[in-house]
């Protein structure tokens, strides 16, 4: 397998708190990896380090052989990494189509001035963005809402739109932060199908998720964090039976344990 992502010794402090403690992770092209652990384990902090919202204090993150730790988010997006957020970050008073087009703007070359002046290249790129956005809305199953404001969509459809927006930048690695949060069982199954279809499009996926049915159902490997430390890594069947994981996470929550 070809490794496209590597984190070595990633450490992050917030004051006197060590939120991440020398976390190592290698991701191979085409994998679906789940990152699990109790609340406060450092999962979102790790995502934030990868996507450039914060910089690690120690260690290094590389993608496709290039160091990306410490880069600004827009530069990391240009390298081919995109993400969603647990708390949806959509433009409420923009249409679903426009939200996805914004997601793809990082791939354009015209720039803001060209867009304002409506240069020929800007018009061509806008047409390309619109066509790409329509295809992605069809892919996630909400193309009929393309002209609706994001705030008027149902919660489940806003979740789908968030994924379409992230796909708009044409990523090689997609980070999904609790994509199943708040979804009903039917929507959750549809999400699982969608994630495997995303992988089939050649996109590697790293997921933070608490729903063990999702984790165990679609993951190639599972990584477990606890208090900022990676305590386990393995196949879903291995993680499910790991006594350290059961003690630290699965065994703490009756609902989680039953779902697993």
Regions found by a protein language model. Name each.
Residues 1-260:
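Glycine-rich phosphate-binding loops of nucleotide-dependent enzymes
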């Amino acid at each position: 397998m070809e490794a496209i992502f590597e984190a070595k010794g990633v450490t992050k402090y917030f004051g006197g708190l060590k939120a991440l403690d020398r976390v190592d992770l290698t991701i191979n092209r085409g994998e679906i990896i789940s990152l699990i652990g109790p609340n406060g384990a450092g999962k979102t902090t790790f995502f934030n380090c990868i996507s450039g919202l914060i910089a690690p204090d120690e260690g290094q993150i590389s993608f496709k052989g290039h160091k990306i730790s410490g880069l600004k988010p827009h530069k990391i997006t240009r390298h081919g990494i995109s993400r969603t957020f647990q708390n949806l970050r959509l433009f409420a008073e923009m249409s679903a189509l426009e939200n996805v087009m914004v997601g793809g703007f990082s791939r354009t070359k015209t720039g803001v001035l060209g867009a304002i002046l409506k240069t020929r290249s800007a018009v061509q790129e806008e047409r390309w963005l619109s066509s790409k956005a329509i295809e992605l809305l069809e892919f996630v199953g909400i193309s009929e809402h393309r002209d609706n404001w994001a705030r008027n969509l149902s919660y489940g459809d806003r979740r789908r739109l968030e994924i379409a927006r992230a796909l708009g930048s044409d990523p090689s690695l997609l980070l999904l932060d609790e994509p199943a949060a708040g979804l009903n069982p039917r929507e959750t199954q549809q999400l699982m199908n969608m994630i495997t279809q995303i992988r089939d499009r050649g996109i590697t996926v790293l997921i933070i998720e608490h729903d063990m049915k999702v984790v165990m159902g679609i993951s190639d490997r599972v990584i477990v964090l606890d208090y900022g430390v990676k305590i386990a890594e393995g196949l879903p069947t291995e993680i499910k039976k790991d006594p350290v994981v059961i003690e630290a996470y699965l065994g703490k929550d009756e609902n989680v344990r039953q779902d697993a």
